[in-house]
Amino acid sequence: AKGNRLAELRDILLGTVKTGFRELYPVRFPWLNSTQESAVNKVLCARDVAIVHGPPGTGKTTTLVEAIYETLHREPQVLVCAQSNMAVDWISEKLVDRGVNVLRIGNPTRVNDKMLSFTYERRFENHPLYPELWSIRVKN
């Protein structure tokens, strides 16, 4: 990929191109500590990609959920990736609890039970036209 958005994001992730940040007034989140609040504001200012990294127990999930929730007030969708299925499930659960429409992508056998109904496969299976689509597939 050259000269398109995918190529641009690839180059940013590889570190060959610097990411940009917008100038925004900081948003106050009184329920977060100062480090979490600063991280959420940094995510909100990111033009392209934001990474939240830290040791266990430092509030990354809380920070990410708030950042994602706030970003969804400004953008139509957000792609969230994590190092493990458990981390993705945990973030997804917290977002669902806040009323966010989550589509959980990944191997359904590695998704926890609570998040199964949010997987692509389950949504497809629950679609009203699924039986008809399945019968067409079986015939071919």
What do these predicted ranges mean?
Residues L13-R22, A39, V52:
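Active-site cores of enzymes that catalyze phosphoryl transfer or operate on phosphate-rich substrates
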Residues T16-V17, F21-Y25, Y69, Q77, ...:
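Conserved P-loop NTPase motor core of helicases/translocases
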Residues G57:
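Walker A (P-loop) phosphate-binding loop of P-loop NTPases
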Residues T61-Y69:
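Motif I (Walker A/P-loop) of helicase-class P-loop NTPases
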Residues R28-D48, T62-T63:
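N-terminal pre-P-loop "Q-motif" helix
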Residues A1-V17:
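Interdomain "pre-motor" coupling segment immediately N-terminal to P-loop NTPase/helicase cores
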Residues L72:
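Conserved ATPase "switch" residues in P-loop NTPase domains
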Residues A46-V52, E75-P76:
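Pre-Walker A (Motif I) flank of P-loop NTPase domains
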